[in-house]
Amino acid sequence: MNMRPLNKILAGAILITCCWMNLANATLINRGNGMIYDSVQNITWLQNANLSGTKMNWEDSLAWADSLSVGSFDDWRLSNPDPICGLAVYNCTVNELGHLFYNEFGLTQGQGVSSLFSGTNANFNLFINVQASVYWSGAEYAPLTASAWYFNTKTGIQSAGNKQKGLYYGWAVRDGDVVAVPAFRSLAIFGLGLLGLAACKRQGRQRAKLGAV
């Protein structure tokens, strides 16, 4: 038996709503042009985790990220650490790279990204040239300003190294998304919800009339 027109509309509305909700709940999204959006942290990573092609000291790494222009955006920076986690610690997921390492890549303490090089981890495979090594963060280590924070993707540790003597990689990131979210999305979802509610009420009234006959 064919569905009634009202039921078809309701089914379509539910399907569209579910699709939009799934999109909104996505974590890592390939935006193209070498950029990956993290909807949980609301930041956009460079897809190429070694775009510079070389290790640098901290100041050169900062300058490199600041000079980048990718996808018409020029507000790139190095990732943020989390000083509250502390020095030489694992499982620091508030650290932006730590969140990517532990939450998105699903790695554990001491495991390292090299375990994913030839695997089928969908999140990890969105990126290229991820190094199993040390990446500078964009902040000084306050107790010793000759040092700066870093994150080691070989072990999953957050720590700090000498700004001048330490030669590590840089992985640029920027705040926010690189694609504007349609302003009508929320209104559309709300409207579809009202449509479903109206359909349910209408069917309820029809059943009540039939029961009264």
Regions found by a protein language model. Name each.
Residues N2-A11:
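Bacterial N-terminal signal peptides that target proteins for export
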Residues A11-C19:
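Bacterial N-terminal signal peptides
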Residues T27-R77, L167-V173:
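Extracellular adhesion/carbohydrate-recognition regions
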